[in-house]
Regions:
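Short alpha-helical segments enriched in small residues
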Residues: 284-443
Length: 443
């Protein structure tokens, strides 16, 4: 229940969405500001961050508000229920968690927070202006399509269709916008740095950006070349994320000073909840026996099939006490023939090539099944000169797969540091593979 008379008694209400406000948070904030002002409530929507979605600002609002906190501020929250060191006088939300907000609190499981606010306005007889009605449609589609929200309700989407007819909205435009597709710009560097955020990693930082697309068409080499120039002593890595909302895949490209990694996952992942925590664990990992200890603690058995690393992954695992309890076995399959003898299907090698993500995946699955282990690691690639038996090989390009649980998405590793010795490259590869396993086990 919202007590309008009580809210009118405040002189400085700040309406705020969650940090790094998404589209729904911003629509909710601007919509509620419009309603409150017309009800005689002194309120202003402000952003907690210095960032605002450029497309949102240019297409719909054309203004930017950054919050400069004052001691006499009171807060009205939209699209979240975080705690603050200032009084909270109310909240609209649409998440399943019920917060301990004692008054002026409405939390309903609707497709978007903006729809919760819109429905409340209708219930008190307030007529929402056409422009904000349109924004609410966009907010509902953004949450329901782009992120496959579990909060999406069929009745809300039916309402959206009714509003689209009312306002003569182009359905294709609405749906495409609902997918959250990143608008192309002529400036490629600006395009792939959409949504830049910085994350602390000890005394260093990781930077990340993302784009949302409906088809994979971006040039990997161009992305790496652009982001490599951003790597410094302070910024140790850049995590670029490309979400394909049609194929429902997420491509992750992690660029560091010496190498970059590419992985495509067969589902849409959250940057904040899924990707960045794993990246931070990966970059923080040390080859100090942690993996062996984790496998022992979790009672997980592992097997490896190694080509270019020549058994060094298994060797590193057994450098630490207790490895006999978790390492089931290891195969060094340095040639195509030995891979086939070990159980890798000839057709996979012939169709995709021995140096490919498909072959790495096949190696991981094969060794896992052969040794009846919980985890299988497969690795293939070239550290040096072109392999005469495999002329398509590229020096410094490695593929590895880790078959664990029901999901396995192979990773491409490319070294970008010239003149790195074969020995150093081999050990670095082992460290990277074990760090990847560490991040998987830590989830």
């Amino acid at each position: 229940m919202i007590n309008i008379d009580e809210l009118r008694s405040y002189s400085n209400i700040k309406i705020i969405g969650h940090r790094h406000a998404d589209f729904d948070s911003m629509v909710s904030g601007y919509l509620l500001e419009n309603i409150f002002l017309n009800l005689g409530i002194k309120a202003q929507f402000v952003l907690q961050d210095n960032e605002e979605d450029i497309f949102f600002k240019e297409k719909f609002i054309g203004r930017k508000r950054t919050w400069r906190k004052r001691s006499d501020d009171v807060l009205f929250l939209v699209d979240h229920t975080a705690e603050y060191d200032l009084p909270v006088v109310g909240c609209f939300d649409h998440h399943p968690e019920i917060a301990h907000i004692e008054k002026n609190y409405i939390n309903e499981p609707k497709t978007s927070c903006a729809k919760v606010i819109y429905d409340w306005a209708q219930s008190i007889g307030y007529t929402v202006p056409n422009g904000y009605e349109v924004l609410t449609v966009y907010a509902c589609y953004m949450d329901s399509l782009s992120f496959k929200s579990t909060k999406a309700r069929p009745e809300d989407l039916e309402w959206c269709k009714e509003m689209m007819r009312k306002h003569n909205m182009d359905e294709n435009e609405v749906v495409n916008f609902g997918y959250g597709l990143t608008p192309k710009t002529e400036n490629f560097a600006q395009y792939i740095k959409t949504g830049v955020k910085t994350y602390p990693l000890g005394d260093k930082v990781i930077k990340s950006s993302y784009i949302v697309v409906d088809k994979d068409e971006e040039d990997e080499n161009q992305i790496v070349a652009t982001l490599s120039s951003e790597i410094t002593k302070k910024t140790v890595a850049w995590c670029f994320i490309m979400s394909n909302v049609i194929a429902e895949t997420t491509k992750i490209l992690l660029v560091t000073q010496d190498y970059y990694l590419v992985q495509t996952v067969d589902k849409l992942l959250s940057r904040g909840k899924n990707i960045i925590p794993a990246v931070m664990t990966f970059l923080s990992a040390k080859n100090d026996g942690t993996i062996t200890k984790m496998l022992i603690e979790k009672q997980l058995e592992i097997a490896t099939m190694e080509s270019c690393t020549s058994g060094l992954i298994a060797s590193n695992i057994t450098d630490y006490e207790g490895a006999s309890a978790i390492l089931k076995g290891s195969c060094i399959t340095y040639s195509n023939e030995t891979k086939i003898l070990a159980g890798v299907r000839r057709g996979v090698i012939e169709e995709y090539g021995v140096y490919s993500p498909e072959t790495a995946s096949e190696m991981a699955l094969t060794t896992k099944m052969k040794f009846m282990a919980d985890i299988g690691i497969g690795i293939t690639g070239s550290f040096g000169n072109i392999d005469p038996k495999n002329p398509d090989s590229v020096a410094g390009v490695i593929f590895y797969g880790i078959n664990y649980s029901q999901e396995e998405n192979p990773i491409k590793l490319v070294y970008t540091t010239p003149n790195m010795s074969r020995k150093d490259m081999k050990q670095k590869t082992v460290d990277i593979v074990l760090a990847t396993l560490n991040a998987m086990l830590a989830q």
